[in-house]
Regions:
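Conserved small/polar residues in nucleotide/adenosyl-binding loops
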Residues: 431-438
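Conserved small-residue-rich beta-alpha loop and adjacent elements
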Residues: 99-165
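C-terminal core of ALDH-fold dehydrogenases
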Residues: 315-427
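Short acidic-hydrophobic, aromatic-tinged amphipathic segments that line or gate anion-handling sites
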Residues: 175-179, 301-306
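Conserved NAD(P)+-binding/catalytic subdomain of aldehyde/semialdehyde dehydrogenases
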Residues: 169-249, 253-258
Length: 438
């Protein structure tokens, strides 16, 4: 058994860029000192935008009136499905409970939404309407009270009108004309009269990703996101045209977007490798430039001897998006374990999940699918534990806790049990016994 690379990536997609880190650290330090004015000046510098940062209610109403109905209908279509899926997640995401662990000792958990979420919505190369739906809707369904949305402004316009419309529809309380590092810093530090975000979610470029990484700890984040990825598992029964189109569909995201094909059919692989450059050549300039570089530098075609090998290599790569176009779909679905989101069968495709089918498109990259999933209602919800006790239950629990503490050499811990045992009329070693380890 062996695998053969018919096309091997000459580069390794990486977000470990010391130059990016230095730039982002300097910008964050500047904003920490200059606050809102720093965000305003950097927005003028980077986005050539010098209008209001906070999108006004009047601007939102203006967009509602001027945006064409078909666009609004399509956004509503996406919103309805993403909301329905998020509601299903919430319904099945654990429960508040309390249980009696022993007589008089009760413990439980309580699910509590974070107070404030910051949602970053990219708007550089493309107007990512769907990212507004994915982040804001999921936070709203989770029960977050304050939702701040940020998206890069365009000169003289502000954030893209469809992004503003979508963020408002999905439940954003405030929308800011901010992008990049200033946006992440503003949401983290509670600028422009907003509370500081407890968590920041949403995709972005390397500067957004690095700002989130640096600020993680001060603020929660959804995940460390790298360039978007696609993996496709395909056998001899797959349609090479559809496989090729789907690879190109993700490659257009950016010059460093990996696209991988795992197949047991050399004939299919060769057809796909021939067709991909042809499809790229037919694209408009911006997506063509992105896709050409992505396929050239980060595209791989891996020939496997068996279905088991395809599962193994796919799980090693743990792609953000994974399509399965094979004869035995159920067999693969049951065995694959590492991916961000799975698209089972030719009938579905990554673009459906990216835009409107309901599952979230904010997903783990760079192999993180080995240990985490994508954005879901649970990212906005804290699972908090609690306990309460009767005085009678202290006799057993207090004594055991005191003994364990002394075994560990933690006398002050032990005495917190002793003082209660003494108060409630039970025997104890209050303040008298050194640790048995001494």
């Amino acid at each position: 058994m062996a695998i053969t690379y018919l096309k091997k990536s000459p580069k390794t997609s990486s977000t470990d860029d010391t130059k990016t880190t230095g730039i982002v650290q300097d910008l964050l330090k500047d904003i920490e000192k200059t606050k809102e004015q720093g965000c305003i000046e950097l927005t003028k510098k980077f986005d050539k935008y010098d209008g209001e940062i906070v999108v006004s209610k009047e601007r939102i109403e203006e967009i509602k009136k001027t945006l064409d109905q078909k666009t609004k209908d399509d956004i509503q279509f996406s919103y309805d499905r993403v909301r329905k899926f998020a509601e299903a997640q919430l319904k099945n995401y654990g429960q508040n409970f309390e249980v009696e662990l022993s007589e008089g000792l009760y413990a439980g958990q309580k699910l509590v939404p974070v107070n404030t979420a910051g949602c970053y919505i990219p708007g550089g190369r493309y107007a990512h309407i769907a990212s507004a739906v994915m982040s804001v809707t999921t936070a709203k369904v989770a029960g977050v009270k304050n939702i701040i949305a940020c998206s890069p402004p365009k000169e003289g316009v502000g954030a893209h009108p469809t992004i503003v419309y979508t963020a408002d529809l999905c439940g954003a309380d405030v929308i800011l004309n901010l992008g990049g590092v200033p946006a992440i810093a503003a949401m983290t530090n509670g600028l422009f009269k907003n509370p500081p975000a407890d968590i920041i979610v949403g995709p972005g470029n390397q500067f957004v990703a690095e700002a989130k990484r640096i600020l993680f700890g001060k603020v929660g984040i959804d995940l460390f996101a790298g360039p978007t990825e696609i993996g496709i598992i395909a056998d001899a029964k797959a349609d090479p045209e559809i496989v090729a189109v789907d690879l190109v569909g993700q490659a257009e995201h950016g010059y460093n977007s990996p696209c991988w094909l795992y197949t047991t059919s050399k004939e299919l692989a060769e057809k796909v490798m021939k067709r991909v450059p042809e499809l790229i050549a037919e694209l408009p300039e911006v997506p063509r430039t992105n896709a050409d570089a992505a396929w050239r530098d980060y595209g791989e075609v891996i020939l496997c001897d068996t279905d088991e090998e395809m599962v193994k290599i796919s799980d090693e790569y743990a792609p953000e998006h994974l399509e399965v176009q094979t004869e035995n779909l159920k067999w693969f679905h049951e065995r694959l374990t590492n991916y961000g989101s799975l698209f089972v069968g030719e009938e579905t495709t990554v673009a459906y999940g990216d835009k409107c089918s309901g599952t979230n498109h904010i997903l783990p990259t760079k192999g993180a699918g080995r240990y985490t999933g994508g954005l879901f209602v649970g990212k906005f919800i804290k699972t908090l534990s609690f306990q309460r006790m009767t005085k009678e239950s202290t006799e057993l629990v207090g004594a055991a806790a005191a003994r364990i503490s002394r075994y560990e050499g933690m006398e002050a811990h032990a005495r917190t049990g002793d003082v209660r045992l003494k108060k409630y009329g039970y025997s104890c070693l209050l303040y008298t016994s050194p640790s048995p380890r001494d």
